[in-house]
């Protein structure tokens, strides 16, 4: 189980970082950015994984949380981003497996929809990244995996 957690942690971090660099390649002005929490007291700021003009992109390889506080924090984060004049966009490459986590993702999608922020998950996330950047990261990673198969 520890090996699995280790793999998930680092593979996920790699995918999120690779996604940021795809966005940065297409849009050199892309940057990580913080907005003030104008809704609540904690945290004082929220990080935007990738800000490109008015697009505030949240990059997740997967979000398997089942914590109810997660919805509250995400709702506050999305509202603060919107109030700061940005469009919150979520791209999540892999959907969680557990029922409670799936329900939380459905709630988050509703929150994004409510502020006019797109929410892309699974294949839609890969497609969005390719359309937005012109870079087919899924294909690139598949090619790397194929080259290294059996090594």
Set out the residue ranges of the language-model regions:
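Domain-level recognition of nuclease-like catalytic cores that cleave nucleotide substrates
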Residues: 93-151
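Catalytic cores of nucleic-acid endonucleases
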Residues: 61-113
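Conserved catalytic cores of phosphodiester-cleaving nucleases, focusing on short active-site segments
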Residues: 50-61
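Interdomain/boundary linker segments immediately adjacent to catalytic/signaling cores
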Residues: 1-27
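Amphipathic coiled-coil/heptad-repeat helices and related helical stalk/stem segments
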Residues: 16, 43-44, 74
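Active-site metal-binding core of divalent-cation-utilizing nuclease and nuclease-like domains
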Residues: 32-51
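Secondary-structure boundary elements
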Residues: 24-31, 53, 83-85
């Amino acid at each position: 189980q520890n090996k699995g957690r280790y793999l998930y942690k680092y593979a996920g971090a790699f995918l999120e970082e690779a996604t940021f660099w795809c966005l940065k390649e297409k849009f050199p002005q892309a940057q990580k950015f913080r907005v003030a929490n104008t809704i609540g007291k904690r945290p004082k700021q929220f990080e935007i994984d990738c800000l490109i003009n008015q697009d505030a992109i949240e990059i997740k390889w997967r979000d398997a949380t089942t914590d109810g506080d997660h919805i509250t924090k995400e709702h506050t984060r999305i509202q603060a981003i919107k109030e700061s004049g940005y469009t919150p966009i979520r791209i999540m490459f892999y959907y969680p497996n557990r029922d409670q986590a799936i329900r939380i993702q459905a709630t988050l999608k509703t929150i994004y929809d409510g502020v006019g922020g797109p929410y892309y998950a699974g294949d839609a996330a890969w497609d969005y990244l390719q359309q937005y950047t012109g870079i087919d990261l899924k294909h690139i990673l598949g090619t790397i995996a194929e080259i290294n198969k059996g090594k």
